Amino acid sequence: MIEEHTKIHTEEGHMETFITFPEEGGPFPTIFFFMDAPGKQEELHDMARRVAATGYYVMLPNLYYRSTEHFELDFETFSNSGEMFELMSSIGNRMIVRDALTMIELAESDPNADSQNIGCIGYCMSGPFALSVAAAYPEAVKAAASIYGVRLVVDSSDSPHLGFNQTNGEIYIACAEFDDYVPPEMVTQVSEELSNSSANGRVELYEGVHHGFAFPGRGEYNKEAAERHWERVHALFDRNLK
C-alpha cells in the first residue's frame, strides 16, 4: 500500500490530508473519508487503509484545518472535549462542500486516482457532510454513506435531506438503535424523506447497538454491527464505483 500525508491548499488554509491506495492496478476510484468529531487520528487511518486495500484511492482530510493543524480527543481523560465541541461548531455542510471541490481537483491531478468515480463516507459529525457533498457534485459522486450521522434532517437551508433530489449516486444511511444524538423520530423522518425523493438509497437501523458501534477503539464498539457496516459500505462502493 502507498501512504502519504499532503496539504491540500484551499482558499481558507492548508488542509492536511492522509492519502492511501494500492501499489498496483490504478487508477482507483476515489473515496472521501470524512473524520468524526474526535479528529483525524490513527484509528481512522486504519479504517481508511481497510477501504483502500480493496482497490480505492482514499483521502482522509483534517476538517478542522481552519482552526488547527491537528486535533485528537483524549479518550482517557476527555480533558480537551471542550475544544472538540468548539471545533465541531466551527464547521458545517457548506464549508465541507467547498473543501470537497479542492479534493476533487487533487484527485484529477493524480494519475493514481479516478476522479470520475467518487464515493463519500462520514461518521457521526461527518455523516451529513458525505450526503451534502454527494448532492453538490452529483456527476462525480456515485455513492455516499452516512454511518450514525447526526443532523440529517434539520430546519436549515443546507439540511442534507434537502439534497436528496439532487443526488445521482446511491445513498446508504446506517443508524444505531440507541443514539442520544439521533433520536428515533429523526431516523423515521430521514427514512421518509429519502423514500419520497428521487434518490436511490436506503436507511438501515442497527438494532441493539449504540452510537459509535463501528469504531474498534471505543467503548461502544460492536464487532458484529461493525462488520455488517463494512459489508454494506464495501458493497455500496463496489456496486457504484467499479
Predicted regions and their residues:
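N-terminal cap/leader regions of alpha/beta-hydrolase-fold enzymes
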Residues: M1-K242
